[in-house]
């Protein structure tokens, strides 16, 4: 009768330790290491210590490459998400006081005042220059710090630069505009004033010319444009809300 084979306790402990090492490594590294590789690394019964080191180095290298690729993809996505929108035609600051936005064709915006109503201004002139377009006339106004508005005659090509509040009258071919169409405050831009310096009836005119009136009036630092009435205010006559 054959007696059952009895292994020494240290052999049993060693086998159990090898099995647990295999399971632990396979769970730890997941799909990056097969069970066979885990066995070859952990058991120490099939391969040499040098082979086990090479196996781990190989898997660490592959894991490092995957992590680097993931990091690169995440960084590219972050750059796309945070990159500001590009302007195809960004706004430019015109010479002189105040911004002036340009159209896609590079021309200044002159849409805030009528071009075909024969509207002139009797206000004292700073200068008269010959230019080829109303946009060029606006540029001339912006180049002079005191210019508040201009009158351009499309027939004579004369650009009349003004430094006071507009005083309108009718003249064939005239068009009158502010130094920039970007000044477009209406209604609630300025409010809660006590004493008005001047109230002007600007029926048919835009708020840009109300701004021009304030710039061209001594002591005016604020204005309201409500309906068709432009009201100018001095420094000590208001409480800004």
UniProtKB/Swiss-Prot annotation:
This is Microneme antigen. The keyword Disulfide bond applies. Contains six disulfide bonds. Its main location: cytoplasm. Residues 61-83 have a biased composition (Basic and acidic residues). Residues 112-181, 185-241 form the PAN domain. Keywords: Cell adhesion, Cytoplasmic vesicle, Disulfide bond, Lectin, Repeat, Signal. GO terms for molecular function: carbohydrate binding. Residues 35-103 form a propeptide. GO terms for biological process: cell adhesion; proteolysis. Residues 1-34 form the signal peptide. It is found in: Cytoplasmic vesicle, Secretory vesicle, Microneme. It comes from Sarcocystis muris. Galactose-binding lectin. Plays a role in adhesion to the host cell. Has a potential role in invasion of host cells. PROSITE patterns: PAN (PS50948). Belongs to the microneme antigen family.
